[in-house]
Amino acid sequence: QNDIISIYDFSSFAQELCDLSLDGILTTFSALLSESSHLTFEVFDVEVLMKTKTMLFSSSPQKVVFETFDRKQRLNICSETTHFYDQMRYQLLPDDFQLEIDFEGNPLSEIFDKLSNIFSLIYLSSSASLNRGILELHIAGQRTLEYQCRCNSIASNPELYKIYNWIYTDGNATDKSLIARNILCLHCRFSDIQKIDGKTFASIQSNYNLYLKDNVAQYIQLTNKLAEFISDVVSKTGDYAVSLLEKFKTNLFAILGFLFTVVLANIVSDQPLDNIFTRDITFILEAVLFI
């Protein structure tokens, strides 16, 4: 279900939104998005077009279609990968603010970009908290990275969202996040995580590809060992079946020989067969046949 909110003075709306505290902005959007999968703001006074994966500001909203994006599933995956202490209060994602479509002179571009960066940093971390405008991050990798900054000082850096989006789109988010955090801890040992560049992302992708190759090699090795085991079991089963058949044949010939001897002896004696095949003799014959 998509909710439509009418805006009759876009400039005033943008000014009032930017004048809110960070907590006020986040609380407002979190409440709105908790009730709807997408938000549509229909602007009546000026021509605008601004879009994220979950929000649209447009003078003609009926002409714009949202792409499929399971927001609840993404929130669940993020919560499994990162412990964000304030997630119940701020159920928001970088995707809610990452602009896919923008227009020149947009008064909301800066605040949306800042919010996208804040939540990208949060979900790149092992754990994070957001309190009174202070963002605290803990990133556990080969080293441990502790980071703290004021949210109003966070600068624009598209690489943060790129890494976040790569982690949580396709593949195993847990494995990807662990590799990303290892690289971030190494690359940001003496530099600010906000200043990472394309080389950091390239290094993360390269290490992940090596990880996949190692996993494929281990899978092939395990498959080969399993095939050898199955082949060995089948071979031993066949040998056992042949051995069992040979024993059965041997015992069968012995029984036939015994019966022939008994019948022959009965011909030359006056003792009836009923007295020879007693219950005990029959039990012994059956035991010999099937041993």
Language-model region placement:
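Extended, non-transmembrane interaction/recognition domains
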Residues: 2-195
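Extended aliphatic helical segments
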Residues: 43-48, 64-65, 216, 233-234, ...
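Alpha-helical transmembrane segments of integral membrane proteins, especially early/N-terminal helices
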Residues: 158-176, 207-215, 244-256
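Short, non-transmembrane cytosolic segments of multipass membrane proteins
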Residues: 179-218
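A contiguous, surface-oriented mixed alpha/beta subdomain in the mid-to-C-terminal portion of proteins
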Residues: 208-216, 220-223, 247, 266-271
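Transmembrane alpha-helical segments and their cytosolic interface motifs
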Residues: 222-266
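Transmembrane alpha-helical hairpins and terminal membrane-anchor modules
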Residues: 250-291
